[in-house]
Amino acid sequence: MSMPATSTKTTKLATSLIDEYALLGWRAMLTEVNLSPKPGLVDRINCGAHKDMALEDFHRSALAIQGWLPRFIEFGACSAEMAPEAVLHGLRPIGMACEGDMFRATAGVNTHKGSIFSLGLLCAAIGRLLQLNQPVTPTTVCSTAASFCRGLTDRELRTNNSQLTAGQRLYQQLGLTGARGEAEAGYPLVINHALPHYLTLLDQGLDPELALLDTLLLLMAINGDTNVASRGGEGGLRWLQREAQTLLQKGGIRTPADLDYLRQFDRECIERNLSPGGSADLLILTWFLAQI
């Protein structure tokens, strides 16, 4: 399909550099979905609490999305002289077109809608920073993405109307701001918690997969995951957070033997129909930012 126009301004970014970041985004999505075992989530072992999707759907989806990540980077570069609050409006048509390709690749299954939003924001932030010759670090990328989203929670979650979206309902009932709130705040769960935790475990010599699984547990323990709350309500969310915190307090995932705890957690999540998809999206960002 034809790609939406991004800007009439040209960028000075090398295609090879743009493609390098886009490849990292694709690898981040594949790293997350292939990570196993993950409680309630699709992985190499089972489909978690999802009856409508399989591992291959995520592989096809990630490939479809990879083709659009350069467009987000290019728009971020082309719009570098715009006020940051104006950038999100221009990103939306790119995101919608990317989402359309995702649904075509998966025959209508929503595999990575959250990642299109979050990776799209981070890629646009990278493009802006590169164009302005500013350092590209996890902190600068996330703070730039936050500047794009200024006022987003107020505009989209606090609006009163008769037809509440799922996000608006969870915000009004439980105060959860979900992906919008995390983006507007500059991804503090990633920058302040998941990323330093993951990097510390790697520095200690822990196997990278075990380090990622332990980091997923950390995210599940502290994230007000709207995916979980939409399936299990406040009770389901609090249960999942407590279980993840309990595993962390017992020592977390440090050896292959600890995977038995995750397998049991997975079975319990499936029985309760709970899937921490929001935490999975944040794990994708954690791995992505760890590479830059």
Swiss-Prot record:
GO BP annotation list: prosthetic group biosynthetic process
An example molecular function term from Gene Ontology annotations: ATP binding
EC number in record: 2.4.2.52
InterPro entries on file: CitG, TriPribosyl-deP-CoA_syn_CitG
Domain of life: Bacteria
Induction annotation: Repressed by H-NS. Part of the citCDEFXG operon.
Keywords, in A-Z order: ATP-binding, Nucleotide-binding, Transferase
Function: Catalyzes the formation of 2-(5''-triphosphoribosyl)-3'-dephosphocoenzyme-A, the precursor of the prosthetic group of the holo-acyl carrier protein (gamma chain) of citrate lyase, from ATP and dephospho-CoA.
Alphabetized PANTHER family for the sequence: 2-(5''-TRIPHOSPHORIBOSYL)-3'-DEPHOSPHOCOENZYME-A SYNTHASE (PTHR30201:SF2), TRIPHOSPHORIBOSYL-DEPHOSPHO-COA SYNTHASE (PTHR30201)
Family: Belongs to the CitG/MdcB family.
Protein name as annotated: 2-(5''-triphosphoribosyl)-3'-dephosphocoenzyme-A synthase
Species annotation: Escherichia coli (strain K12)
